[in-house]
């Protein structure tokens, strides 16, 4: 069998965090009743005219600046003509000839080191509606709430060679866009979607192979599976002497396989022409400077600040800043309790464990930084011990409970009264003569068994340090 390399380029669609759509005043809120966020403009009614949302341009330019793109200072919209039920106008307003941003790059890091992935362009466009297929009724219905929601499409060059590089690129893009506040980039809600273009070729070959486009990829895990699956499918075809067909394929993550949707179109198939209802966009130097001045702290700057300001190790700072949401929780909780390393420990250890156990993403954390700060203070004051704190934190993670109220209602405060504890410890000593004898015979580990029995007798509420001290005294 020949040696093949995979060549991958991405088209990443990002829904922008504007309150209204790109060409009309309809709401972009996710989750509304079907066909309630619509008007004549976004449903393509005759005589309706689009008006460009200025915030869309500003977000697009901000993303372009953050990815080292050249900003196109004279930009235009174009019509992309095609018929599909979720496209009420029978064309999409997009950008082909003069996209808003060009020639950028994103630095990624994998186990193989650092690498630059080039960005061919970033263009603005409107989203289509959402088709829902009812397999029982054998019909399809359409919700136009999403029609006209503003998108940027970030088109990479075919610079990636593995699923690992693709995921690193997507994670870096998502972090950058989230930090800018341009989008929440939630794959499960469709506010970030990636179409993956894949081809294979023999190692050392200069010419690209025939590419296929993979769709229906709504998680990083699905993207990685689809890349590996399509790579194997194409290699198998070539090894059998057959040709790879240029087509769009739909990935089914449950079956871990794909099927052909349609032949892959080229630009000429869409008969693009300049959008007649919109004037060109002129982005002046002054406007670019204003957008740049409003740019918030991005991940690289935040990472450096955490190491310096909070004296946090680089590894911890990387984990804390991977998600803007987690970074926001860390900073807010630290501001409230003034204990950055202890807040960091709860996020790095218990939060990451619970996220993994529940197959959740850091962006799905829903507890308040106020409650995390309160928990840190409770432990620091000795009000609860570490084992009780873990129990309380699990309730914070799942239900965002007030830890002070929960500890009070469930009588979880630590037993720190030495007089009260001495009686319990003496009873434990009397009930475990063998452990006492072992301790007196030099087996120091025997005290651990006595501490454990005391903790059991106090239902975990005793302070282990106090228990240890009193045991030593009584023995």
Q: Which residue stretches match the model-derived regions?
A:
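Extended, non-catalytic structural segments that build the interaction scaffolds
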Residues: 287-294, 301, 331-338, 372-384
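Structural motif
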Residues: 2, 311, 334-343, 381-384, ...
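Amphipathic alpha-helical segments in well-ordered regions
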Residues: 63, 230, 333, 346, ...
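Extended hydrophobic-aromatic, low-complexity segments
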Residues: 281-282, 317, 329-331, 342-343, ...
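Basic, nucleic-acid-interacting segments
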Residues: 1-297, 314, 335-339
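Core structural elements
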Residues: 189-202, 270, 307-329, 340-358, ...
């Amino acid at each position: 069998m020949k040696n093949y390399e995979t060549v991958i380029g991405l088209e990443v669609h990002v829904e922008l965090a504007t309150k209204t759509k790109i060409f009309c005043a309809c709401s972009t809120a996710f989750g509304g009743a079907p066909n309630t966020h619509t008007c004549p403009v976004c449903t393509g009614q005759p005589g309706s005219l689009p008006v460009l949302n200025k915030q869309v341009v500003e977000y697009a330019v901000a993303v372009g600046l953050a990815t080292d793109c050249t900003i196109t200072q004279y930009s235009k919209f174009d019509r992309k003509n095609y018929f599909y039920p979720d496209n009420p106008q029978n064309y999409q307003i997009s950008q082909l000839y003069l996209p808003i941003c060009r020639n950028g790059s994103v630095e990624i890091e994998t186990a193989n080191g650092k690498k630059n992935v080039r960005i061919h362009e970033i263009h603005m466009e409107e989203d289509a509606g959402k088709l829902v297929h009812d397999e029982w009724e054998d019909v399809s219905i359409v919700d136009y709430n999403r029609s006209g929601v503003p998108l940027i499409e970030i088109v990479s060059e075919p610079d990636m060679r593995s699923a690992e590089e693709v995921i690193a690129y997507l994670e870096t893009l998502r972090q950058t866009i989230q930090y800018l506040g341009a989008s929440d980039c939630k794959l499960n809600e469709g506010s970030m979607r990636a179409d993956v273009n894949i081809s294979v070729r023999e190692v050392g070959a200069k010419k690209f192979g025939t590419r296929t486009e993979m769709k229906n990829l709504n998680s990083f895990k699905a993207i990685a599976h689809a890349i590996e699956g399509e790579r194997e499918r194409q290699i198998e075809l070539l090894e059998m002497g057959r040709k790879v067909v240029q087509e769009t394929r739909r990935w089914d993550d449950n079956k871990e396989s794909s099927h052909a949707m349609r032949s892959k179109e080229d630009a000429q198939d869409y008969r693009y022409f300049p959008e007649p209802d919109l004037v060109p966009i002129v982005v002046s130097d002054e406007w670019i400077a204003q957008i740049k001045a409003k740019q918030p702290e991005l991940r690289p700057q935040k990472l450096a600040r955490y190491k310096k300001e909070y004296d946090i190790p680089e590894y911890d700072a990387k984990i804390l800043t991977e998600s803007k949401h987690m970074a926001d929780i860390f900073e807010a909780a630290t501001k409230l309790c003034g204990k950055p390393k202890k807040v960091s420990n709860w996020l790095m250890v218990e939060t990451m464990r619970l996220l993994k156990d529940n197959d959740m993403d850091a962006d799905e954390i829903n507890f308040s930084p106020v409650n995390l700060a309160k928990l840190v203070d409770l432990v620091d004051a000795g009000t609860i011990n570490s084992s009780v704190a873990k129990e309380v934190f699990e309730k914070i993670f799942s239900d965002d409970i007030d830890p002070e109220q929960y500890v009070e209602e469930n009588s979880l405060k630590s037993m720190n009264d030495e007089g009260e504890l001495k009686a319990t410890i003496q009873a434990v000593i009397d009930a475990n003569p063998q452990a006492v004898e072992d301790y007196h015979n030099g087996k120091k580990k025997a005290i651990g068994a006595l501490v454990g029995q005391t903790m059991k007798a106090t239902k975990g509420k005793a302070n282990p340090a106090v228990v240890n001290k009193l045991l030593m005294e009584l023995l």
